[in-house]
Amino acid sequence: MAIGKRLNKAREGVDREKLYPLAEAIKMVKERAKAKFDETIEVAINLGVDPRHADQMVRGVVTLPNGTGRTLRVGVFARGAKADEAKAAGADVVGAEDLVEKVQNGSIDFDRCIATPDMMPLVGRLGKVLGPRGLMPNPKIGTVTMDVTGAVKGAKGGSVEFRVEKAGILQAGVGKASFSEEKLVENIKALADAVSKAKPAGSKGTYIQRVAVSSTMGPGVKVEPGTILG
């Protein structure tokens, strides 16, 4: 079946104007996840912020209680004992100057990037390469740290970085279609709680304005914003 026809069929029974309680929305999304692979369940949250202003940026990291269902490759910039610690914690790629050179040459073989503070003068040169991919280590989200073990295990264990993009939209993968409805609800509520705690001082009016959930190949289902909290 062509993708367009499949999506149209999946939209059947979804009222595009209605706001559904979170649990009901998740049930509908799961029922419509019919691809031949385990689709990712994604949430999109429209926030009452303008990320063009520094005092309205929303960014953070949260460990989802039920993981993401995705196996991440973790890269660590570290030397000596910290490099050994990263390897022992399960990092997939570890290095210093050698890893910087690989990245500069276009070899980026990781989905999450961590660095010890002493490596940042070197890693800073990679801003134009790592930045656009959302991979630049940042102390605010715990990816510039001396706790290499904690950062690697967190990334491997289901931590999700979130960041508001243009137009005030924040998007994140919160699990797989194979997850139970209960686990997906728990993950979304954990993300919503972290996003709420990250509310910037510059945000005025309603903070969480609109919410929708979807699967990789399925239609979006609008959610009552109040049902993703608590």
From Swiss-Prot:
One of its GO terms (biological process) is translation. The keyword DNA-binding does not apply. Keywords: Repressor, Ribonucleoprotein, Ribosomal protein, RNA-binding, rRNA-binding, Translation regulation, tRNA-binding. InterPro entries: Ribosom_uL1_bac-type, Ribosomal_uL1, Ribosomal_uL1-like, Ribosomal_uL1/biogenesis, Ribosomal_uL1_3-a/b-sand, Ribosomal_uL1_CS. One of its GO terms (molecular function) is structural constituent of ribosome. One of its GO terms (cellular component) is cytosolic large ribosomal subunit. Signal peptide: none annotated. CDD domains: Ribosomal_L1. It holds the Pfam family Ribosomal_L1. Belongs to the universal ribosomal protein uL1 family. Binds directly to 23S rRNA. The L1 stalk is quite mobile in the ribosome, and is involved in E site tRNA release. Part of the 50S ribosomal subunit. This is Large ribosomal subunit protein uL1. It comes from Bradyrhizobium diazoefficiens (strain JCM 10833 / BCRC 13528 / IAM 13628 / NBRC 14792 / USDA 110). The gene is rplA.
